[in-house]
A protein has these predicted regions:
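Juxtamembrane intracellular "pre-TM" segments in multi-pass secondary transporters
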Residues: 2-17, 205-233
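Helix-loop boundary and gating motifs at the non-cytosolic
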Residues: 13-63, 239-258
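Hydrophobic core of transmembrane alpha-helices in multi-pass small-molecule transporters
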Residues: 28, 110-134, 320-335
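Transmembrane alpha-helices of Major Facilitator/SLC transporters
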Residues: 64-68, 267-290
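Helix-to-loop junctions at the C-terminal end of transmembrane segments
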Residues: 69-82, 281-295, 379
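C-terminal ends and interior cores of transmembrane alpha-helices
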Residues: 91-114, 304-317
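Cytoplasmic helix-loop-helix junction between adjacent transmembrane helices
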Residues: 124-163
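C-terminal transmembrane helical hairpin of 12-TM major facilitator-type secondary transporters
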Residues: 294-340
Length: 408
C-alpha cells in the first residue's frame, strides 16, 4: 500500500510539473511579445512621427482596458476553468500580435498619417488587452489549485519567472533581427506564441466540474476587501515605478547617446535583457532554492530597486552605469513582485484564488494605467525627477504591503 501511495504521489507530481512547465512556455511567449513591444515601440514611434507622450497614452489606455476587464476575467476563470480561460487568452494574444505587426508596418512606411497611426495602434493594443487579460491570472490560478499554501509562494514565483524568461528572449530577438525590419521580430513572436497555444491544447486538462452560483459569489474579491486592499495599492505602486522606467528607457537611450531609431534597438534590447536576466536568476535560483521569507524578499527588493534608480540619476551618459542600474532593478522587482503577490494569495482561501488572481492582475494593470503616461510626461520635463518619483513609490508600495503582513 505504501509503495502504491508513493507511486501515485510521484505520478501526480510529474503530471503537475508537466502542466506547470506548459504554462511557463505560454507565459514565456507572452513575455517575448511584451518586451519586444517596449524594445521596438519607442524607436518606431519616432520614425512614425508620434510624440513620446502619445506612446505613453497608448500603453496607458490599453492598461486601463485591462484593469476594467480584470474583474470579469477573474469570474470567467472560476466559471470556465483556468485551462479554458488560459487557452482563449493565448489564442487572442497570437492574433493580436499579428495585427500589431501589421499596424506598425503600415505606420512606419507612412502608408497612413501619424495621427491615423496613433489611433490604429491604440485600438489594436486596447482590443488585445481586453481579450488577453485572463492569461496571467488563469495561469496563477492553475498553479494555486495544484499547490499547498506552503508551496504557493514558490509556485507563483515560477509563473513570474516565466515572464522573465520571455523578457530575456524578447529584447535579444528584437536587437538581433530588429535591424532588418520592425515587423520581423513581431512575426517571429507570433509564431512562437502559436506553438504555446498548441502545446496548451495537448497538455493542459479541462476542469472536471463547474462552480455553483453560491461558490461564484464567495470567490468574488472586491476592492473594498480589507484583507487585500493594501496589497492592491502596493502592487499598483510597484508597477507604476516599473512601467515608468520600462516605458521611458528607450527614449532615454536615444536622447542621452544621440542614437538613431534603428541603432538604439540593439542597445535597448541589451538593457532590457540584462534586467530580465537578473530578475529570472533571482526568481529561479534565490526564491526557488533558498525559499526566503516574504519580509526578506520585500525589503531586499526595495533597497535593490532604490539602488538601481540612484544609479540612473548618478551615472548618466555611461552604458556601464545603465547596465548596473538594470541589474539592480531586475533583482529588486524580481523579489518585490512575487513577495507582494504571495501576500495576497496567502491572505485568502483556496476557493478565492481565482478571484484574487484576477484582482492582482488588475492591480498591476492599474499601475500601467498610471505609469506610462506619468513617466513619459515627467521624462519630458526632467529624467532625474522621474527616477526620484520611482524611488518614492517603491517605498510606499512596501509600506502598504506591510499593513497586511503585520495583521497576519
Amino acid at each position: 500500500m505504501d509503495s502504491y501511495n508513493k507511486e501515485t504521489i510521484r505520478n501526480t507530481y510529474s503530471a503537475g510539473l508537466i502542466h506547470h512547465l506548459t504554462l511557463v512556455v505560454g507565459l514565456v511567449c507572452v513575455g517575448i511579445g511584451q518586451t519586444l513591444l517596449y524594445t521596438i515601440l519607442g524607436p518606431a514611434s519616432r520614425k512614425i512621427g508620434i510624440s513620446d507622450f502619445s506612446v505613453g497614452i497608448i500603453v496607458t489606455i490599453a492598461a486601463l482596458v485591462i484593469t476594467l476587464s480584470s474583474g470579469m476575467w477573474g469570474r470567467l476563470i472560476d466559471r470556465l476553468g483556468s485551462r479554458n480561460a488560459y487557452l482563449a487568452g493565448m489564442i487572442f494574444y497570437t492574433t493580436g500580435t499579428l495585427f500589431l505587426g501589421y499596424g506598425l508596418h503600415i505606420s512606419v512606411n507612412h502608408s497612413i498619417s501619424a495621427l491615423s497611426a496613433f489611433y490604429l495602434l491604440l485600438v489594436i493594443r486596447s482590443l488585445t488587452g481586453f481579450l488577453t487579460a485572463g492569461i496571467h491570472p488563469a495561469a496563477m490560478t492553475y498553479v494555486a489549485e495544484s499547490t499547498s499554501s506552503k508551496e504557493r509562494g514558490a509556485g507563483i514565483a515560477l509563473i513570474a519567472s516565466a515572464y522573465g524568461i520571455g523578457s530575456i528572449i524578447g529584447p535579444i530577438l528584437g536587437s538581433v533581427i530588429g535591424k532588418v525590419s520592425f515587423l520581423l521580430p513581431i512575426l517571429v513572436a507570433s509564431a512562437i506564441s502559436l506553438l504555446g497555444v498548441i502545446l496548451g491544447f495537448l497538455v493542459l486538462k479541462p476542469q472536471k466540474k463547474s462552480l455553483t452560483n453560491k461558490e461564484k459569489e464567495r470567490i468574488l474579491i472586491r476592492l473594498t476587501d480589507k484583507r487585500v486592499l493594501p496589497i492592491f495599492i502596493g502592487i499598483s505602486l510597484t508597477y507604476v515605478g516599473f512601467s515608468c522606467f520600462q516605458q521611458t528607457l528607450s527614449f532615454y537611450v536615444q536622447d542621452v547617446f544621440n542614437l538613431s531609431p534603428e541603432r538604439s534597438i540593439s542597445k535597448i534590447g541589451g538593457l532590457f535583457a540584462t534586467m530580465a536576466a537578473f530578475m529570472i536568476i533571482t526568481q529561479l535560483l534565490l526564491i526557488q532554492i533558498i525559499k526566503p521569507s516574504i519580509n526578506f524578499l520585500l525589503y531586499c527588493g526595495m533597497w535593490s530597486c532604490v539602488t538601481g534608480f540612484m544609479f540612473l540619476i548618478l551615472t548618466t551618459q555611461t552604458f556601464n552605469g545603465l547596465y548596473l542600474a538594470c541589474g539592480f532593478l531586475g533583482i529588486g522587482f524580481g523579489m518585490m513582485i512575487p513577495a507582494i503577490q504571495s501576500s495576497a494569495s496567502l491572505a485568502v482561501t483556496k476557493d478565492e484564488q481565482g478571484g484574487v488572481s484576477g484582482f492582482l492582475f488588475g492591480a498591476s494593470a492599474f499601475g500601467y494605467v498610471i505609469g506610462p503616461a506619468l513617466g513619459t510626461y515627467i521624462y519630458s520635463i526632467n529624467s532625474n525627477i522621474l527616477f526620484l518619483i520611482c524611488i518614492v513609490v517603491t517605498f510606499l508600495s512596501v509600506f502598504s504591503t506591510r499593513i497586511v503582513l503585520n495583521k497576519k
